[in-house]
Amino acid sequence: MAELEDRDWQRLDKWFWCARFMKARADCAHFIAGGLVRINCQPTEKAHARLRIGDVLTLPINQAAGVRVIRVVALATRRGPAVEARLLYEEIVEP
């Protein structure tokens, strides 16, 4: 299998897990399969969707809070501490 440095993409479920959005990778896959996650405005139900640096993710938070929009700024090499995970993305706040 190719090392991460040789690829310009990463599986969506693995990136979610490394970015610490969920505790288990299976939970990430189940969340994505719900069809509410969007990559660059395109809905996806595929945990194996390819995620690249610069992609914009739209994630549902809850009915009251609406959505969370983030930009991928790095691909993960491992699941590290929360401080490290926070460096994988940046929040996009609407004016």
Protein language model annotation of sequence segments:
Residues M1-K14, C18, A26-H30, R38-P95:
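Strongly charged
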Residues G35:
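Glycine-centered, phosphate/nucleic-acid-interacting loop/turn motifs that mediate DNA/RNA or nucleotide
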